Curated annotation (Swiss-Prot):
Source taxon at top rank: Bacteria
Any single biological process term in GO: translation
PANTHER family attached to this UniProt entry: 30S RIBOSOMAL PROTEIN S2 PROKARYOTIC AND ORGANELLAR, SMALL RIBOSOMAL SUBUNIT PROTEIN US2M
GO MF: structural constituent of ribosome
Protein name in the entry: Small ribosomal subunit protein uS2
Ubl conjugation listed as a keyword: no
GO cellular component: cytosolic small ribosomal subunit
Keyword Ribosomal protein set for record: yes
Biased composition (Polar residues): 250-259
Family recorded in the similarity comment: Belongs to the universal ribosomal protein uS2 family.
Source species: Tropheryma whipplei (strain Twist)
Keywords: Ribonucleoprotein, Ribosomal protein
Pfam families for the chain: Ribosomal_S2
Amino acid sequence: MFWRGGLPLVTIRNLLDNGVHFGHTTQRWNPKMKGFILTERCGSYILDMRETIRGIVTAVDFIRDTVARGGEVLFIGTKRQAQQVIFKQASRVGQHYIAHRWLGGLLTNFSTVSKSLVRMKELEEARLDDSVSTKKEQLIRGRELQKLRRSLGGIRNMTKLPALLWVVDTNREGIAVEEARKLGIPVVAILDSNCDPDLVQFPIPGNDDSIRSIELLTGIVADAVAQGLVERHKAPQDDIEPMAEWEKQLLQSGDSSGETRPISGTDRPLDGDLSKGPAPQDEELSD
């Protein structure tokens, strides 16, 4: 058992039980990942879970401290295996997410994206007043709103650039990683055996194709965010923003000492039912 801040973080058994150690076939690999690979078995690489533990410990500290100082996290995972996990875990701790498709310039041209967010909210308000438009206009606006929600629903409340990114599959999300690099935004990411570790500041070697692996690691990241939120609101009241209602509920769900629940991997309770899908504004997450 590895410990951090008095809480159990994760175990090698957690990682193995969730298939985090499985890499790609030996034909699909990045030589820069050599230091994170333990061995080869049956034509596939086995990742070194000791390196994964080190990556998790370092990343959790950074995420917790960043959120405690007021930073926000953008969760990114648009591959089918990651969509529901990203939506669920980011929503659980009130963070932003992209789970459908990354829009080029979302970070580097955020001022333009912000205008689209304003437009989305205008359309939502206009939809409540059916008397100001014809049925045809309502249909056109409805389609525009659906498109905006599909692309930007997960960042509807993002008013500034995130302090860090959590990325599932840096190869697929290469544009997002590159935009973050240009802006100096740190990236925490799952790195499979075919990824480039030089592109991220906080690599966590792991299987980025397995739903169980993605859920375990993303859940750990979300728990680190939750711990950071608790620490943020332990600061002097004059130095922090008023606590949002969802943050009050998060604190109330902890124990009497104010600690968040332990990060225990496979024993983590799930919030809601994945089979029910995302919230209404994100009902088209899947391709």
